[in-house]
């Protein structure tokens, strides 16, 4: 009789429902209620690689007394260094510009081809580098929409990732840039 539990995953996405309450009087004057829902999953697509996504939406049910640090802030980036949390961050979004105390919805998706394309090119196959494509979107009361696409090469020397990102934001503003990331935990 086995004495261990083996979790083999699920074919269904993971859903998290959250609620956050700031109670005034406990050494603070903040008073707000935030309800959130998040869904994420990794979908194995055989030879075509893996598709991963994370979507989150939230609404401040009460925002009676809030300070800027209590707002919902989105993981942005204004440097050439990529955030390791690829499925919860934007590549080109300015810091704090679109932070909100009302409602929001964001979604991130990436497809890792796991060599599906590059393995057909002899020198690239030998280098074991892999291709990745991603998309990111943000909606909230501060703007109509913000979109990003990124195209990258990962597993360079097993730990380095290069991305080229394109962003399209409010008022028809385009942005683009290169990013470098390291997939190693120190």
Segments predicted by a language model, with ranges:
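Exposed, low-structure sequence patches enriched in small/polar residues
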Residues: 1-186
């Amino acid at each position: 009789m086995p004495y261990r539990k083996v979790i083999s995953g699920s074919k269904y996405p993971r859903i998290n429902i959250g609620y956050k309450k700031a109670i005034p009087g406990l050494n603070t004057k903040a008073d707000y209620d935030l309800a959130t829902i998040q869904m994420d999953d990794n979908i194995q697509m055989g030879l075509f690689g893996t598709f991963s996504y994370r979507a989150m939406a939230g609404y401040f049910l009460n925002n009676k007394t809030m300070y800027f640090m209590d707002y919902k802030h989105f993981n942005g980036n204004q440097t050439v260094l990529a955030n390791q949390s690829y499925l919860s961050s934007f590549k080109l979004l300015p810091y704090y510009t679109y932070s909100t105390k009302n409602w929001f919805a964001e979604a991130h998706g990436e497809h890792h081809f796991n060599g599906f394309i590059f393995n057909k090119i002899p020198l690239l196959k030998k280098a074991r580098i892999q291709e990745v494509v991603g998309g990111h979107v943000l909606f909230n009361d501060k703007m109509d929409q913000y979109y990003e696409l990124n195209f990258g090469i990962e597993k360079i020397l097993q730990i380095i990732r290069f991305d080229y990102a394109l962003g399209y934001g409010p008022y028809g503003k385009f942005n683009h840039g290169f990013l470098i990331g390291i997939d190693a935990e120190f």
